[in-house]
Amino acid sequence: MATSSSSYGIEQLQKGCYYEWMSVQAKHIVDLKEALMSHRSKEDHKLEELVGKIVNDFQKYTEKRSELSRRSCSSYFAPSWNSPLENGLLWMGGCRPSSFIRVIYSLCGSQAETQLSQYLLKIDENVEVNHGGSMSDLNASQLAKINDLHIKVIEKEDKITKKSANLQENVADMPIAIAAYATDLMNGDVVVEDALDKYEEGMAVLMVEADKLRFETLRKIVDVVTPVQAAEFLLAGKRLHISLHEWGRVREEQRFGCVRTDAAAATGGAGTEKSKRSSLLM
């Protein structure tokens, strides 16, 4: 794994990879909007090409992440480029693959999620979304396949989560316990470093496994649905991802804005009181 001297450089590469992907997603949203608005029933091949390109772009992104995580994976579990809101929703360095299917359920027209569906699918305030073969038209066979996929994905998520828990328990096990009571501090530090290196290597493996599950889940969903449905699903998912990033950023700006205001008020008050005391001494 990376040494402390190179960790910062690797984190910057990871951050650059993330923002590059966010830029690509923004372009995907524009392309999907245009494709859905201009779609004709006999032009599914155009949507198929676009959907295929987007899936391939996601695969390239996960492969690049995997390469960078093998060099240092710690940053992916609490990224500095994310807001606390986003980091609180992370699972193994990203979103849960099962959340992809939750988006589908939302788009299918559940009454409890109608407003969310309308927001996610909003292409333009003045344009109605009304495509033949949309997510609201999923048939029984498609729903059955998606439900089966949902169950399998959750099982795989649980397995990865359990592996992660085992790694965490191992870190606090014998190597760390022995180091805590080591009389030779230098030898103790070496033991701890070895244990933490093994932990980070193990977490990098699990993150790669999680990224593969994310990609495979996306690919299988696209295989089940029609080109129009796939485009709507991808548009909704990307809008949600970018919106979460923006919501988190705005919340932090508001929060830190309040903190700065309070701090300025406190500092100003102290300064005023100090000036009063000074004037009394003169």
UniProtKB/Swiss-Prot annotation:
Database matches in Pfam families: DOG1
Coiled-coil region list: none
Domain DOG1: 11-254
Deletion consequences: No germination phenotype.
GO molecular function: sequence-specific DNA binding
A Gene Ontology biological process term: DNA-templated transcription
InterPro entries: Seed_Dev/Stress_Resp_Reg, TGA_domain
PANTHER family, A to Z: DOG1 DOMAIN-CONTAINING PROTEIN (PTHR46354), PROTEIN DOG1-LIKE 2-RELATED (PTHR46354:SF11)
Entry protein name: Protein DOG1-like 3
